Structures are given as C-alpha cells and as structure tokens.
C-alpha cells in the first residue's frame, strides 16, 4: 500500500479490525520511510449480473427500495426494511461468490420477506416469479398455507401477521 504522505511503495499493518457492520476491514498502517500512520478500509466487492448482462455493484439500498414497493400500505417499519436489507446482504456475501445474478439476489430476498410480511412477500414473488395468471397466485397462496399450518400446530409461526385466511366457500 502506497503511503499517502510520501508515496513510499510499502507500509506496515499496525492494527486490523472489522467494522461495526462486519462488511469491511479497517487497517491502521505505518509508513517505514516517513513513519506517519494512516487508515485504510478494505471491502470485498460484490457484483450483480443483471439479465441484460451488465454488471454493477451490489446495493443494499436498491434491495430495500424494491422491497419497500412490495410493502407499500403494509405495517412494515423502516427499521424492519433496514434489517431485511442487512440480512439479504449477509446472505449473498456468505455464498463466497464475488458475482451473483439478480436471480440469486431475489432468492435471498424471498426468505426474510416471507418472515416479515406475507402480503408483501406475495407481491414481491408475483413480480419476481413473473406470475401471469390467477393460478400462479393460487399456487403461491397454497404453498404459504402449507408452510404455515405445520408451524402453527407446533405453536410457532413464521411471522406475526396471523393466519392466512381461507376464502369463503372453500372451508371443509
């Protein structure tokens, strides 16, 4: 690492720590030539490959913005959206891959969003999975019901939004 003061081509690492959010490493360095100290912050780049083939850096803000649209009119706080964004970023970084597709990012969003709000999950999934018929929605709702019923019997549940109501005329 070049010294920013004297441009010496080398430096010694004095201290290394992870940042509070755990996504970067902060290094305190010292120049062997001028003995001045400076700090560097190192972050592994995470790139997203879009459908068009264009590659761009992963953006937690973009994830939150997309999920916010699905949560419009729902009782979801900004804090909950920020936590979801962090969980998604942690999940995609945990893959160890430097490049991900938008499909991979979408998959990483679905799980935490389903725990956060079922209606927002269904809205997001309808766009992400390109629902084009009523049957697609019905299949997704049936899948949600199947997933929730065993959890409710055991006293658990995946989110605090209550049970998925059964439409009139379909009850046993």
Curated annotation (Swiss-Prot):
Stated family: Belongs to the NrdR family.
Organism: Streptomyces clavuligerus
Gene field: nrdR
PANTHER family: TRANSCRIPTIONAL REPRESSOR NRDR
Zinc finger motifs (unnamed), residue ranges: 3-34
Name under which the protein is recorded: Transcriptional repressor NrdR
Pfam family, one: Zn_ribbon_NrdR
Cofactor(s) needed for function: Zn(2+)
Summary of the function given for this chain in its UniProt record: Negatively regulates transcription of bacterial ribonucleotide reductase nrd genes and operons by binding to NrdR-boxes.
Domain of life, source organism: Bacteria
Annotated region (Disordered), positions in chain: 152-172
């Amino acid at each position: 690492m070049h010294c920013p003061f004297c441009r010496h081509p080398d430096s010694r690492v004095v201290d290394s720590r992870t940042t509070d959010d755990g996504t970067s490493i902060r290094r305190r360095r010292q120049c062997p030539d001028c003995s001045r100290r400076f700090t560097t912050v190192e972050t592994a780049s995470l790139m997203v490959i879009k459908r068009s083939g264009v590659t761009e850096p992963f953006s937690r803000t973009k994830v939150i913005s997309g999920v916010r649209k699905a949560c419009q009119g729902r009782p979801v706080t900004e804090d909950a959206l920020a936590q979801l964004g962090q969980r998604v970023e942690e999940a995609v970084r945990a893959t160890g891959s430097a490049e991900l597709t938008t499909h991979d990012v979408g998959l990483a969003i679905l799980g935490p969003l389903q725990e956060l709000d079922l209606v927002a999950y269904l809205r997001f999934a309808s766009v992400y999975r390109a629902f084009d018929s009523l049957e697609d929605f019905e299949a997704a709702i049936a899948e949600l019901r199947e997933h929730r019923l065993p959890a409710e019997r055991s006293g658990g549940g995946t989110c605090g939004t209550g049970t998925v109501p059964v439409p009139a005329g379909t009850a046993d």
